[in-house]
Amino acid sequence: MRAIFLILCSVLLNGCLGMPESVKPVSDFELNNYLGKWYEVARLDHSFERGLSQVTAEYRVRNDGGISVLNRGYSEEKGEWKEAEGKAYFVNGSTDGYLKVSFFGPFYGSYVVFELDRENYSYAFVSGPNTEYLWLLSRTPTVERGILDKFIEMSKERGFDTNRLIYVQQQ
């Protein structure tokens, strides 16, 4: 089961480095502030996360200078946790919120932080290589309505179909 989850992640992100024209990565990104556990509050649906609740992502520094990624979610249908372990590296330098992430071999996809609470790193708006990939991450299982509204507005302005957002159940 885990192997299928990893393969799906990789196939869908295979060779997808780039970002929507309307999306620009944050500058002055501070990796040490970004490390740790994040809760997925909202996302656009994809087969590799379909049906998952209680989704989290955890980021840690790797020995090679990259970032280890551990995505985890619960499948109610199967009554089990699914995990995907990956690695990420900066594309343009460590102060730019633009990374490439891989969950399978040499295949990488874009991970673009386009909005961020710069003071506390309490939330992040993240895009993939195109407007089909979008996430709202938070240090807490839920966010204030104002942050959610900002996420929806900024995402809509950048061409994401916010009517298709899935709000992740976190317990």
From Swiss-Prot:
Lipidation (S-diacylglycerol cysteine): 16
Pfam families for this protein: Lipocalin_2
Keyword annotations from UniProtKB, A to Z: Cell outer membrane, Lipid-binding, Lipoprotein, Membrane, Palmitate, Signal
InterPro entries assigned: Calycin, Lipocalin_ApoD, Lipocalin_bac, Lipocalin_Blc-like_dom, Lipocalin_CS, Lipocln_cytosolic_FA-bd_dom
Endpoints of the signal sequence: 1-15
Location in the cell: Cell outer membrane
GO cellular component terms listed in the entry, alphabetical order: cell outer membrane
Membrane topology listed for this record: Lipid-anchor
GO molecular function: lipid binding
GO aspect biological process, one term: response to stress
Positions of transmembrane segments: none
The organism's place on the tree of life at top rank: Bacteria
Lipid moiety-binding region (N-palmitoyl cysteine): 16
Gene3D superfamilies reported in the protein's UniProt record: 2.40.128.20
Main location: membrane
Subunit text: Homodimer.
Listed name of the protein: Outer membrane lipoprotein Blc
Gene giving rise to this polypeptide: blc
